[in-house]
Amino acid sequence: MNMEIAGHEFFDVDGSTIWYDLQTPRGEVFWLAAATPDGKRRWYHLDRDQWSVHFNISPDGKKFAGDGGDEEMVAHARDGKWIYLFTPRAIPDVAGISAPNADDLVHPGTLQAERLVDMKKHDYRLEPNIIFTRDGKWLIFRSNMHGDVHTYMVEVAKHAN
C-alpha cells in the first residue's frame, strides 16, 4: 500500500515469529502484525489511542503490552498516554466465505486493551520501553512522569484473566 509503514520489530517468545507495528497508511490505520517462518501473517487492529511506540509479548505468548504515545507522535493520539495490556482476539470466519487461498492471506484480529498506568505526565521524548518479567506477572518500564527518570513495575497478573 502506498504510504504504508512498519517498524519497531520484536520477536515472539520462541524467536521464530517477528512482530511489528504496521500502519496502512501511515498515521491512519493501526495494526500489531506478525510474519511467521511458514509465511503466515496475522494482523491485530487497534484504535488510534491504543497505538504504542513499542509493543512486547508475554512469556506465554498470550498477551501483549504497549507503552502508549502522545499527540506529537505518528498516531496523534488524544488519549494514548497509557501503559496497556492487550489480549488478542482472532476474527473467526463464521460466515463460511473464505477465499480459496485463505491460508495465504492475512489472518485478522483485534486487540482488547486494558489501561494499566496513566502516563499523562510522562514526556514521550523518553520512550518507556516496556518488558514483561520472565514469570509474566509484571511489566517493567521507565518513565519521567515524576520528574527524574525512574524504573517502574506494574502488576499484570491481576489484570490478565
Briefly describe each language-model feature range.
Residues 9, 30-34, 81-85, 130, ...:
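Hydrophobic beta-strand positions in blades of beta-propellers and related beta-sheet-rich domains
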Residues 1-21, 48-73, 121-139:
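Conserved beta-propeller blade repeats
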